[in-house]
């Protein structure tokens, strides 16, 4: 552990001598500018999909709040027939719990946990 501390201090001192403070400030500014440019280009690309202004400096607190987002309604229509899951005997709506049956008297027994159902012929 002590060897690690000595190594870290040595590397820090070496970097301080190799890169004076003025160079570190300019490197830091260049890094910040490149990161901001990268983020702005990503936001520009994402903004082209959303159709909104995307550069980082154009955003306000109102743009970033979720209250202003529009909530979409995904509830299915009540009696809309889904052709993928429908037959002439049974029509299942797009809702998970709604099922409309016609022209059938089939009863399906579903066993509960711990209550096995013996098949009846």
From Swiss-Prot:
Its main location: secreted. Keywords: Secreted, Signal. It comes from the Eukaryota. The keyword Secreted applies. Kidney, submaxillary gland, urine. InterPro entries: KAR_prot. Induction: By androgens. GO terms for cellular component: extracellular region. This is Kidney androgen-regulated protein. It comes from Mus musculus.
């Amino acid at each position: 552990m002590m060897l690690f501390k000595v190594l870290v201090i040595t590397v820090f001192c070496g970097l301080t001598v190799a890169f004076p403070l003025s160079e570190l400030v300019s490197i830091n500014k260049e890094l910040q500018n490149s990161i901001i440019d990268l983020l702005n280009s990503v936001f520009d690309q994402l903004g082209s999909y959303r159709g909104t202004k995307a550069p980082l400096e154009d955003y306000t607190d109102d743009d970033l709040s979720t209250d202003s987002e529009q909530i979409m309604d995904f509830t299915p229509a009540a009696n809309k027939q889904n052709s993928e899951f429908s037959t002439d005997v049974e029509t299942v709506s797009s809702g998970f719990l709604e099922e409309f049956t016609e022209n059938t008297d089939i009863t399906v027994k579903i066993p509960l946990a711990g209550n096995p159902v013996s098949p009846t012929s």
